[in-house]
């Protein structure tokens, strides 16, 4: 009975539950039917892309949308306030003579995105601050007021994605149009000034890519490009279309400790403003640029054993390179492993082929460091694009671009500079061995740049010119103590100098020293940043007593004659004379050595380059006039910070340059010029430039004689200039063509300076200082010196320059001499030339009255 009652209860409950389930199911079905009948609400995000042809690139980073020639970023809100880097590079061009593929924006932009009201704003972090220690809340508040982050650009918010995890905004103005934020077009091309005017209406977006840490936007931009030489327009504006790749990359929150710069080291750097502690003054701090190399086995490294780095520097080699190029490229890159082995790193650098099976590999992804092959008409030397975290100086990635016509460049250099000595290069093309040797040389130097090293143009000046003609010396020491010098081949070696090395040997002692300073590992758990700095500073103190281990900063090239690009040896006059002998041999044999060149195109390019090289030699020697040697050394080293070039060498250099200019056309091969298609002889053109160069040297002499009154003075400069240029007047004879051109240049400059000084009350020498200022007074830097500072002392040119007085005195003497000369029996052309000079002098004197 009891069992029956229990069963009855269960039956009742079961029925009730069943009824409830049926009712719920019915309601749910009704709700489903209702939801199906009601359309889903369309969001702003949906409408933004609805019925539009959209190209989308997705990744963990930023999703990029391209539609209607516009670019939209879909930025995860988790990336707001995360620092990023904006850069640009040239990827193609319609005019390789003006624009070089691989050229990059000079200053990548550090920024972050933030939301302000209804806009996304692009802010630049005030990353000049570097806090060495924990600061107080009050100091932090004061810093926040005085070092705010600036807003560079704003973008209207178009929508949020459907789960509101990302914001969508239009970045076409930033990444789809030419922008002043990151200008990629050149402003100089050799001696020519370049002006590029963007044509926004002719801008087109070619493609987009998105990776885990960066995005790429590829564009075609059209510019109106014009050239000028010394402010004189050369031709009209010409349309030039360039491929421009913009990249936005996430800056990693690197844990690498910065290395405090020493200005005596030739390494690139990032600048910060140090805030040491409350109550102390700010100070400028510089971090060297370097890869984060940490030994895999720290204990073995500490014992002096060769150790693999935990993360070696890996470069991916483009598989489109000609097969014969790949080995010299590898050798050029891996040459630097010799320097890393000296400081305990084994296989610090690797070169591997483009992966065939790694699905996520893309050479356009800037997190991969690649060596790219660029099919281009440009015969430029390789260039590199380096991405640095400015917060620490860590090099995150670097890529090299090698142009398909680099063989032409190497052939030109090798034939012109060594053809007089080396019969094996006297042909239309270099042999495979000579080309491989040259390619390795170029790659080695550019790899140095990708490791953070700067050019060291003064290195070769530490070798005597005579030593460069010595077989034993050049075999052992090479052509310079650094591959970072601008030395191609040994152009001073003569045909009688048997066994002399003609090409660089590889890394020099300076390169080993610089890699040691920049990449020596310090265990951050045991060595503080200050102890590291002090150890390295003492290391440099000891090494730079040897001039061959010094860094000669390019920023001082305006004054220091050792820093003239292309110079070889310590005696510029001797080197120039030897080089000119070799160039004459090559020039006279071009028709014999270069075959199968019916249109003379190859020979004309070589002939033009020889004339340009001769002009470069002239400028190298002229750099002694008004020059000073600038030495970045501690006072305790007892080496003067600046030392004016001796009076004897300045005067000898000026007289050499005057004679060279007046007789420069003797080098011209008129028979060759008549056979070809040369519209104007470069030798004729160069003479005009030489006149301006000679006149400009007076300003440098004004400064150096002010600094050292016992050196070559402006009066002595003008006396030598006058007595040499107007010797034909004193001898009452017709001037040579060279004399006539230089006399006109002198008269033009004299008229400008004297008339300006008397007619307008100003100084013909200009105003202000001709020196770079010493920099902000921000206190002492943690490392030795300031790597951004020009070493030349500051001098107000108006105190030193007396050009108008000396020009005026010269004109007085010249007027008397011309009046006497015109009484002689002169050819009509000479008489007309002298009469015109006398007329101009009298006009100037009228102003004086």
Task: Report the location of each language-model feature.
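Auxiliary tRNA-acceptor-end handling modules of aminoacyl-tRNA synthetases
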Residues: 33-321, 339, 343, 354-407, ...
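Zn2+-dependent metallopeptidase catalytic core
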Residues: 80, 324-348
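Boundary at the C-terminal end of the N-terminal hydrophobic targeting segment
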Residues: 28-30
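The catalytic-center signature of Zn2+-dependent metalloproteases
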Residues: 353-374, 437-494
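Conserved catalytic/binding loops enriched for acidic/polar residues
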Residues: 459-849
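Sec-exported extracytoplasmic/periplasmic mature domains
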Residues: 334-345, 444, 448-449, 489, ...
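Bacterial N-terminal signal peptides that target proteins for export
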Residues: 2-15
């Amino acid at each position: 009975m009891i069992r029956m009652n229990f069963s009855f209860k269960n039956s009742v409950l079961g029925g009730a539950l069943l009824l409830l389930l049926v009712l719920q199911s019915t309601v749910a079905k009704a709700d489903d039917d209702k939801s199906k009948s009601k359309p889903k609400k369309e969001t702003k995000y949906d409408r933004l892309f609805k019925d539009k042809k959209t190209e989308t690139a997705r990744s963990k980073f930023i999703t990029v949308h391209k539609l209607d020639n516009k670019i939209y970023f879909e930025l995860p809100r988790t990336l707001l306030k995360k620092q990023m880097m904006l850069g640009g590079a040239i990827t193609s061009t319609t005019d390789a003579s003006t624009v070089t593929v691989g050229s990059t924006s000079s200053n990548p932009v550090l920024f972050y995105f933030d939301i302000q009201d209804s806009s996304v704003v692009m802010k630049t972090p005030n990353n000049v601050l570097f806090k060495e220690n924990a600061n107080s809340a009050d100091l932090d508040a004061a810093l926040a007021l005085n070092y705010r982050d600036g807003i560079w650009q704003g973008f209207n918010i178009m929508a949020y994605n459907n789960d509101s995890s990302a914001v969508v905004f239009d970045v076409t103005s930033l990444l789809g149009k030419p922008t002043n934020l990151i200008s990629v077009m050149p402003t100089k091309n050799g001696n020519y000034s370049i002006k590029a005017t963007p044509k926004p209406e002719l801008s087109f977006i070619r493609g987009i890519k998105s990776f885990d840490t960066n995005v790429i936007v590829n564009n075609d931009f059209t510019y109106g490009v014009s050239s000028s030489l010394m402010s004189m327009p050369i031709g009209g504006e010409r349309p030039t279309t360039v491929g421009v790749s913009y990249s936005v990359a996430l800056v990693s929150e690197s844990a690498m400790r910065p290395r405090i710069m020493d200005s005596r080291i030739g390494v690139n750097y990032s600048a910060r403003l140090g805030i040491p502690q409350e109550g102390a003054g700010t100070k400028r701090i510089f971090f060297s640029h370097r890869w984060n190399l940490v030994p895999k086995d720290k204990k073995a490294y500490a014992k002096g054993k060769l150790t693999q780095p935990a993360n070696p520097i890996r470069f991916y080699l483009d598989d489109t390179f000609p097969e014969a190029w790949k080995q010299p490229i590898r050798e050029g890159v891996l040459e630097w492993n010799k320097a890393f082995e000296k400081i305990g790193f084994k296989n610090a650098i690797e070169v591997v082929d483009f992966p065939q099976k790694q699905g996520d590999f893309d050479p356009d992804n800037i997190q991969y460091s690649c060596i790219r092959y660029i099919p281009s008409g440009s015969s430029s030397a390789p260039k590199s694009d380096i991405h640095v975290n400015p917060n620490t100086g860590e090099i995150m990635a670097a890529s090299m671009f090698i142009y398909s016509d680099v063989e032409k460049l190497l052939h030109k250099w090798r034939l012109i500079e060594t053809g007089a000595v080396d019969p094996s290069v006297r042909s239309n093309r270099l042999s495979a061995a000579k080309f491989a040797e040259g390619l390795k040389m170029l790659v080695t130097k550019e790899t140095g740049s990708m490791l953070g090293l700067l050019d060291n143009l003064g290195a070769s000046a530490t070798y005597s010119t005579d030593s460069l003609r010595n077989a034993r010396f050049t075999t052992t020491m090479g052509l310079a103590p650094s591959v970072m010098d601008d030395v191609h081949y040994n152009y001073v070696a003569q045909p009688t100098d048997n066994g002399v090395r003609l090409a660089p040997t590889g890394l020099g002692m300076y390169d080993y020293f610089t890699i040691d300073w920049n990449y020596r590992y310090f265990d951050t758990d045991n060595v503080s940043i200050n102890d590291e700095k002090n150890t390295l500073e003492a290391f440099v103190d000891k090494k730079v007593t040897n001039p061959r281990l010094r860094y000669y900063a390019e920023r001082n090239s305006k004054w220091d004659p050792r820093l003239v690009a292309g110079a070889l040896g310590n005696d510029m006059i001797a080197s120039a004379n030897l080089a000119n002998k070799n160039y004459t041999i090559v020039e006279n044999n071009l028709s014999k050595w270069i075959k199968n060149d019916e249109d003379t195109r190859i020979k004309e390019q070589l002939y033009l380059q020889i004339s340009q090289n001769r002009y470069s030699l002239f400028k190298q020697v002229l750099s002694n006039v008004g020059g000073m040697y600038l030495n970045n050394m501690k006072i305790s080293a007892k080496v003067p910070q600046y030392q004016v070039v001796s009076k004897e060498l300045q005067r000898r250099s000026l007289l050499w340059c005057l004679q060279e200019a007046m007789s420069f056309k003797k080098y011209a091969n008129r028979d060759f010029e008549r056979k070809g298609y040369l519209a104007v002889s470069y030798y004729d053109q160069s003479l005009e430039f030489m006149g301006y160069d000679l006149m400009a040297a007076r300003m440098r002499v004004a400064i150096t004689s002010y600094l050292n009154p016992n050196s070559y003075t402006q009066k002595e400069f003008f006396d030598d200039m006058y007595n040499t240029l107007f010797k034909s007047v004193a001898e009452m004879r017709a001037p040579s063509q060279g004399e006539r051109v230089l006399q006109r240049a002198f008269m033009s400059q004299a008229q400008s300076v004297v008339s300006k000084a008397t007619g307008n009350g100003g100084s013909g020498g200009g105003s202000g200082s001709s020196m770079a200022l010493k920099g902000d007074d921000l206190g002492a830097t943690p490392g030795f010196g300031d790597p951004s500072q020009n070493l030349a002392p500051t001098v107000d040119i108006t105190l030193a320059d007396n050009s108008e007085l000396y020009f005026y005195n010269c004109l007085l003497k010249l007027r008397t001499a011309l009046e006497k000369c015109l009484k002689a029996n002169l050819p009509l052309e000479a008489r007309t030339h002298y009469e015109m000079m006398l007329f101009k002098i009298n006009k100037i004197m009228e102003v004086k009255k």
